[in-house]
């Protein structure tokens, strides 16, 4: 079995790392010292599609798999654990339940 990352996964890792280091990293200490939740950074991450990694494109998601999801969470968490866990919680704990168990109207309203 080959456990190597695909070319697309390597590119995703580079892209998320560049985003995290460039857009999130410079602000981490300010949010931490102010003891504030980084709402603005969450919006930036959402605009990149990270809050919909696992969900189909027809519902506004990226249509990617769990390996890609872990890459996104890992790279975001390298720079700021709060953003990484926020993305993980949204994809796994919240939206995934609506996607799996909700009706079509709920999916269209709340996913991703």
Feature annotation, model-predicted:
Residues 1-8:
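Intrinsic disorder at enzyme termini
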Residues 11-22:
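A non-catalytic, amphipathic alpha-helix used as a structural packing/dimerization or gating element
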Residues 21-112:
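Glycine-rich flavin
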């Amino acid at each position: 079995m080959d456990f190597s990352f695909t070319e697309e996964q390597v590119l995703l890792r580079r892209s998320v790392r560049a985003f995290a280091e460039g857009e999130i990293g410079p602000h981490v200490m300010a949010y931490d010292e102010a003891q504030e939740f980084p709402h603005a950074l969450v919006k930036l991450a959402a605009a990149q599609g990270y809050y919909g990694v696992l969900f189909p494109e027809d519902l506004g998601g990226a249509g990617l798999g769990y390996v890609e999801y872990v890459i996104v969470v890992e790279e975001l968490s390298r720079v700021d654990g709060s953003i990484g866990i926020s993305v993980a919680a949204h994809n796994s704990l919240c939206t995934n339940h609506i996607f799996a168990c909700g009706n079509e109207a709920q999916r269209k309203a709340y996913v991703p």
